[in-house]
From Swiss-Prot:
Alphabetical keyword list: ATP-binding, Cytoplasm, Ligase, Nucleotide-binding, RNA-binding, tRNA processing, tRNA-binding
Organism: Streptococcus agalactiae serotype III (strain NEM316)
Family recorded in the similarity comment: Belongs to the TmcAL family.
Official protein name in the record: tRNA(Met) cytidine acetate ligase
Keyword match Membrane: no
Annotated binding of ATP, by residue: 7-20, 96, 152, 175
GO molecular function, one term: ligase activity, forming carbon-nitrogen bonds
Major localization listed first in the record, in broad terms: cytoplasm
Disulfides per UniProt: none
Enzyme class of the recorded protein, top EC level: ligase
Role played: Catalyzes the formation of N(4)-acetylcytidine (ac(4)C) at the wobble position of elongator tRNA(Met), using acetate and ATP as substrates. First activates an acetate ion to form acetyladenylate (Ac-AMP) and then transfers the acetyl group to tRNA to form ac(4)C34.
């Protein structure tokens, strides 16, 4: 049977995600970000809730991406996630895209010209942001001309690179409805951005997602809920360059601005430059918030939930993969667990995120109905 992998954040889970799961074939394995997102922000609702949303709408198995895979630039995010999916026996990668590029051809180009392409990246001016360098690389070697500002394009190309190195087939699905960052109130296929922005509009949320009651009744957070803690971390840390990926230039810019801003958005606006994108600055601020340092990615895979079909698939791979289903005496990843502890501080009603939690079990798979 086909085992389809999907890399996701589900922040929050919406009708577009449900559509993607409906288009996917076979056993559907989701590699999902934990409580902090790829672009450097806390999830609006916690990872367990988002995993439940997915399992109630077609997913068979949801595993958690470690913190230092979740909160990364597109290439590292995709590479880390796809390598984990490959270990779980995934042979097909499904992802949404705004434009149906010839991803198979693009993957072949990368396989055949990987060294040249990586060398091209390294030669690009340091004044360019990483997305700008990546765009130039794809333009040079694959003739792809696009703005480079569409996250699903950038991620789609990153997935293509990662899948080509793991022998995984690609299954791009045309994205339905609103664009990735659209805040418009398109009711059927609203974007995650729009649902977060208009979360107080119950009618809109109910139209835009299949699990609206679960979402609306769950404790929610935004970046600003952590601003006081972030400010404390910045002002009291003796050397911010000890934090993961924070260099002296960025450390100085953050230190010099933190006293004069009242929101995370203001701080990001003050610190970001052409070279250091807002997404990169948010990731760095997330690292500072968590007090993250460079750490090895855990070999074990943490399971957030499954259907009966997903549980059977886990049993078929457990001899070759170290699986963690309960964190207690058995630890997993200390940095992810620290991130979970910080995440809980954003809302007193958030349930325990680590200790003693067991996978959510969806008794009936949507594909069996």
């Amino acid at each position: 049977m086909t085992v389809t992998g999907i890399v996701a954040e589900f922040n929050p889970f919406h009708n577009g995600h449900k559509y993607l799961l409906e288009q996917a074939q076979g056993i559907k394995v989701i590699a999902m970000s934990g409580n902090f997102m790829q672009r450097g922000e806390p999830a609006i609702v916690d990872k367990w809730t988002r995993a439940q949303m997915a399992l109630e709408n077609g997913a068979d198995l949801v595993i958690e991406l470690p913190f230092l895979v979740s909160v990364q630039s597109a290439d590292y995010f995709a590479s880390g996630a796809v390598s984990i999916l490959a270990r779980l026996g995934v042979d097909n990668l499904c992802f949404g895209t705004e434009e149906m590029l010839d991803y198979d051809r693009i993957g072949d180009i990368y396989v055949n010209k990987k060294e040249e392409m990586e060398a091209f990246l390294k030669k690009q001016s340091d004044s360019l942001s990483y997305p700008q360098k990546t765009q130039a690389m794809w333009q040079e070697f694959a003739g792809i001309a696009f703005s480079g500002q569409t996250p699903n394009h950038i991620l789609g190309l990153a997935y293509t690179k990662a899948a080509s190195q793991n022998g995984i087939r690609l299954n791009p699905i045309q994205r339905q409805g609103a664009g990735y960052h659209s805040s418009e109130k398109t009711e059927i296929f609203a974007s995650a951005t729009s649902l977060r922005k208009h979360q107080s509009d119950r009618f809109f949320v109910e139209k835009g997602m299949p699990n609206s009651d679960l979402f609306l009744n769950s404790p929610q957070v935004v970046w600003q809920d952590y601003f006081s803690l972030l400010k404390y971390q910045i002002m009291t840390h003796s050397d911010l360059t000890q934090i993961y990926q924070v260099n002296e230039e960025i450390a100085n810019r953050i230190k010099s601005q933190i006293r004069y801003v009242e929101t995370v958005d203001e701080l990001v606006d003050k610190v970001a430059t052409k070279r250091y994108t807002k997404a990169r600055i948010r990731r760095l601020l997330t690292y500072i918030l968590i007090n993250a340092v460079e750490s090895p990615i855990p070999n074990a895979i943490h399971v957030l939930g499954f259907t009966q079909k997903g549980q059977q698939h886990l049993k078929s791979v457990k001899k070759s993969v170290d699986i963690v289903t309960r964190i207690g005496s058995q630890t997993w990843d200390s940095l992810t667990q620290r991130a979970d502890s910080v995440y809980q501080m954003g809302n007193a009603n958030i349930a325990e995120q680590t200790w003693g939690r067991i996978p959510f079990h969806q008794s009936v798979s949507q594909s069996d109905l």
